[in-house]
């Protein structure tokens, strides 16, 4: 009799004593393990892809991703300007070309070039990850590159901030740059040959 009262007490209190007979548990379907958490980039890429696909579905008539062209992408980028936070001065504005304007103006807020460039990069990758062929990727088209270049240049002029492309560092080749005994590099030039 004492064993019956101790058995229930052990279960309720989380006793580590082994039970005499395990109770059969009803078989419940196990949920699949949670996928690993996405990186910030992957999460943003997924959000951007879903937003773009929703934009295409909202068109009249709706556009399937397989029928998407550069004109749809350009329309999408211009649509996004309404949510921009970067002041871009127009040509008639007194602050056009000034890095730090002294006052307020009514020039529009737009998406910054860097944001658009990063967005296109993510959508380009997402297109291929969702079954698109690289050679038919509308985000990689020349028209998109031209548009981004024009936005970059016009925003740089309007904001007085010149765009400077980062120079790629040359990889150092240890075979080409070995030092000579006199402290000069191993490469020869016409001035070294003349002396």
UniProtKB/Swiss-Prot annotation:
Predominant location category: nucleus
Origin superkingdom: Eukaryota
Aminoacyl-tRNA synthetase found in the keyword field: no
Any matching Pfam family: ALOG_dom
Bias type Low complexity, positions: 184-195
Composition bias type Basic residues, residue spans: 162-175
Subcellular location: Nucleus
Signal peptide positions (record): none
PROSITE patterns: ALOG
Annotated InterPro entries: ALOG (IPR040222), ALOG_dom (IPR006936)
UniProt keyword terms in alphabetical order: Developmental protein, DNA-binding, Nucleus, Transcription, Transcription regulation
All copies of domain ALOG, residue ranges: 40-167
Motif (Nuclear localization signal): 165-169
Bias (Pro residues) ranges: 21-36
GO cellular component, as recorded: nucleus
UniProt record, GO biological process: mRNA transcription; post-embryonic plant morphogenesis
Ranges for region Disordered: 1-41, 154-195
Record has Transcription regulation as a keyword: yes
One MF term in the entry's GO annotations: DNA binding
Summary of the function given for this chain in its UniProt record: Probable transcription regulator that acts as a developmental regulator by promoting cell growth in response to light.
Family: Belongs to the plant homeotic and developmental regulators ALOG protein family.
Name used for this protein in its record: Protein LIGHT-DEPENDENT SHORT HYPOCOTYLS 7
Source species: Arabidopsis thaliana
